[in-house]
Amino acid sequence: MSLISRLKAVVAGDDFLDDDFDELDYASEDEFNGNDDLKQNYKKSNALSNSNPFEFMNNNRTSNVVGMPGIANSSSEVNLMEPRSFDEMPQAIQALRERKTVILNLTMMDPDQAQRAVDFVAGGTYAIDGHQERVGESIFLFAPSCVNVTSSFPEEASPSNVSSKKTSQYKFETNTTPEPAWGESKLSAYN
């Protein structure tokens, strides 16, 4: 077909000269009626379009709710751990995530590793808005946010420990400024 005849057909509105329509295959009505899957899909799509769109959204929202571990049961658990190495610290973090209180007795660890362990578990406790307390020498309490930690020291408040006469065990001389670590100071006001 020449360019001029094609332009005439387009301007005249003659759609029969377009060859693309001849290649389309149409499904016969018998094939469409025989396919049950298409009917079921059509019924489902109509049911969704006729339903309330807000009701459909509310059904999806309830499926996104995730329960917190440890909330369903009303009993509390306390884990007492005596780790020997830093490798056991993720167990303490996992217990805190499960909303369990953890008491760490770090007397069996090297002091440097114990400091590292306390920093690690304290960071995990802070991340879950928990609480931490030092209970004793190398013994620490870490609790999740659902546990209230209060501290009171009855041995300091008891009258048997309070002495009536306050005496100082330190004796001060007239010059109370300490010597600087780098040697004599010429700028001292007490010289």
Curated annotation (Swiss-Prot):
Superkingdom of origin organism: Bacteria
UniProt entry keywords in alphabetical sequence: Cell cycle, Cell division, Cytoplasm, Septation
**Location of the protein in the cell:** Cytoplasm
| Polar residues: bias regions | 153-178
Tell me yes or no: is Cell cycle among this UniProt entry's keywords: yes
Q: Alphabetically, which GO biological process terms does the record hold?
A: division septum assembly; FtsZ-dependent cytokinesis
Q: Where is region (Disordered) located?
A: 153-191
- Answer yes or no on keyword Cell cycle: yes
Q: Single GO cellular component annotation?
A: cytoplasm
InterPro entries linked: Cell_div_SepF, Cell_div_SepF/SepF-rel, SepF-like_sf
Q: What is the annotated role of this protein in its UniProt record?
A: Cell division protein that is part of the divisome complex and is recruited early to the Z-ring. Probably stimulates Z-ring formation, perhaps through the cross-linking of FtsZ protofilaments. Its function overlaps with FtsA.
Q: Which family does it belong to?
A: Belongs to the SepF family.
What does the annotation say about its assembly with partners? Homodimer. Interacts with FtsZ.
Name of this chain's protein: Cell division protein SepF
What lineage is on file?
Answer: Bacteria, Bacillati, Cyanobacteriota, Cyanophyceae, Synechococcales
